[in-house]
Structures are given as C-alpha cells and as structure tokens.
Amino acid sequence: MAKVLVLYYSSYGHIETMAQHIVEGAKSVPGVEVTLKRVPETIPVDQARAIGVKVDQAAPVATVDELADYDAIIFGTPTRFGNMAGQMRTFLDQTGGLWMKGALVGKIGSVFASTGTQHGGQETTITSFHTTLLHHGMVIVGVPYACSGLVNMSEITGGTPYGATTLAGADGSRQPSANELDIARYQGKHVAELASKLAS
C-alpha cells in the first residue's frame, strides 16, 4: 500500500483548506494511505495570535524523521517573496540527516502554494521549492494540462502546471475558489496514482 503525506504550513487557513482538498483527491485512489500533517509554527504563539495567524489547526505537527516513511510527499506553503515560507524552510533545513542516508531518494515530491496577489510569485515559489526536493533525489510531480482547471479563462484563478495554487488577496480575504480546489484535488489524485504505481 502506497503512503502519501500532505505536509503544509498555513498562516491564515488558505493552504490548510487547499491541503484538505489535496487529501480528498489522494484518498479517492484505492489502496493508498493518506496522512495530513503540518510543520511547526516558529512565531511565538502570543505574537502569532496578535497578527491573526491561525494557530489552532486540526492537523498534527510532523517530525522530520517520519518523512522517510512515505512514498510521496505533497508540500504546501504560502509564498514569501517568491519563496517558501520560513516555517517550511526551517523544517526542511533539518532534513540533513535524511539526505545523508538518501532516505528520500526515489520518492515523489510535489508542491502547492498560495499568494496574496495574482502575480505574487506562485510559480517561483513552487519551482524554487523543487530545488530542495531534487537535492534529496525526489521525483518531481506537478499538475498536467489534462487537468481542465488549468486552462480556465473565465475567471481570475490560481493553478499552474507546477502545482495547485490559490490567490488569497492582499488582505487574505479571498478564499480558495471552486476551480482552485478542483485543481488541488486533481493534484492529490495524480500524485497518489503515481505513488501507487511506484510502490507496487
């Protein structure tokens, strides 16, 4: 049985929502075990609450060592100046021991993201994230254009061939759209299908 981990960091809930739909898509594939976890918050709790960070989230916090237990990992992060959030970076910077052992070599790695604006760095966030995964020897999986949501021209929407994305709005008021959530589910299903094939 293939094991898929959806691992995310979410400040205000947008990536958390996307992650839940990624999980939904992955769980639609028979014979795949799907786990949802998050990386630790690095902002002190009082400060985080003061700036509106969603501190209380249902997903348990992951440990670095457990990454080796999965056949595929789908990472989710908000954008910080075209890169992953510092909380995710801090978590991944602790994976040197896994790298030394080659513990993630041959496993699937996939990424989804959120930005505050339409041109806020969605694609650079995902592609720069890929660098870390490639150093670990992971096999990168995105979202193919077989996903019809990628060519939706009837609305402003996230979604890239590199991975699902959502636009949060500069003030965080915009929630993931139906199209963005469809792409997220597609990504989860696509990764799970490939993980199942690799694990068999």
Swiss-Prot record:
SUPFAM superfamilies: Flavoproteins. FMN binds at residues 10-15, 79-81, 114-120, 135. Substrate binds at W99. Residues 4-191 form the Flavodoxin-like domain. The lineage of its organism: Bacteria, Pseudomonadati, Pseudomonadota, Betaproteobacteria, Burkholderiales. It catalyses: a quinone + NADH + H(+) = a quinol + NAD(+); a quinone + NADPH + H(+) = a quinol + NADP(+). Its EC number is 1.6.5.2. This is NAD(P)H dehydrogenase (quinone).
